[in-house]
Amino acid sequence: MNQEDNTGGGGIFGLFKWTKXALFGTDISPSMKYKDQEERRDRSRYAQDDTNFSMKFGNDSNRRSTNLSRSNSWSGLDSTLHRKYELLPEYNENGFNSIVNGDHHSKERIRSLRSPAPIVPREPLRNEPTDTFGHRLHTKRRTINELSNSQIPFIPPQEDDPLLSKLFNKDGVNEVRRSPYKLSVKDIPGKFPSPLTKRDEIDNYYVRDEDACHKNREYKKAYFDLFAQMDLNSRDLEDLCEDVREQREQFHRNEQTYKQAYEEMRAELVNELKKSKTLFENYYSLGQKYKSLKKXLDQTISHEAELATSRERLYQEEDLKNFEIQTLKQRLSDLELKYTNLQIEKDMQRDNYESEIHDLLLQLSLRNNERKDTSAGSNIFSTGQYDRTPFHNGNNSYDSNSHSWDTDYLKKYRRIHRTLKQKS
């Protein structure tokens, strides 16, 4: 019994622990957890663990609900959407608009179709007096300062809470105080309800009356109902796990498909990038060639301009040279004419000279003949002196004192004499 007190599994310490949990909302009541589960047979409503009751519920408009539903293809299909996209409204079997006519079942059906099936129940918890744990913990919006405070906030119970009123009844408390035995965990409400079993440790201290038997039967019925509901919940949980497993397998298949498509798209993108790189390189090389050709064209144009200038200059120089050639030709012709005239004049002078020489030779021969007659047997070319006729011709002159001929005249005379001998 002392060990049970130390561990807090039962007795007065267990009662104190349950009272603290009932007052300050540190846990959830199993009776509230599985309450009204027979009415909610839909798969979207499950009896979940304590996390379902960690939301903020209530009718206060300032409170923000954490029940977020997923969006699907049915979301937003209200009258505003029908008017916006010019859609026909939904009609019931009688041909009237079910939403406009206020058909509650049609509204619920459409609302259930428009919203996906949530794992967490969407209906807010009712303000039941037996909910002494999780619901009261989250009915008040607690700030960060309150959460950071080490002290446990004081939350008073409801005034019309029959469970707490019965729990803190003076007769019951006095009875517990008078009892030499400590209460067990099974006797404390708020935990899993179970039939009252016989306590062997109590030696016929308390005899159960008919009310206790009736309560025992009610506990058994509720207990079996809870087991049946737990069985249904277990089946639904298995179905949910199966659905989750199938969705996970489908997710893996989709992931493999997306991965393969990503690899193919990535390979295609790499090929496109390579082609783009090759195209850019070709475009760059073509641009360089275009620049070089344009530069060569500019150089060619400049060279052509220079060539045209050079050609014009050459034409001018050619004209100048032609003029000089014409001038030189004219001068040459003049010189040739002058040379011809001089040659003719020279020939005439030579003829004159020859005629004079011939006359002189005749005179010389006549004188020689006369001398032969005067001096017989004498030779005009002997070693003795002989007279020479004075002859004046330009620069050739005869000196009367020396009786000698000019040297040039003698040379010319000898040449003429030689010519005459050859002719004869």
UniProtKB/Swiss-Prot annotation:
Chain intervals for the UniProt region annotation (Disordered): 34-76
InterPro entries on file: Bbp1_C, Bbp1_N
GO cellular component, one term: cytoplasm
Pfam families: BBP1_C, BBP1_N
Function (record text): Component of the spindle pole body (SPB) required for insertion of the nascent SPB into the nuclear envelope and for the proper execution of spindle pole body (SPB) duplication. Connects the central plaque of the SPB with the half-bridge. Required for proper localization of CDC5 at the SPB and for proper M-phase progression.
Keywords carried by this UniProt record: Coiled coil, Cytoplasm, Cytoskeleton, Phosphoprotein
Name of the featured protein: Spindle pole component BBP1
Subunit structure: Homodimer. Interacts with KAR1, MPS2 and SPC29.
Native source organism of the sequence: Saccharomyces cerevisiae (strain FostersO) (Baker's yeast)
Regions annotated as coiled coil: 229-355
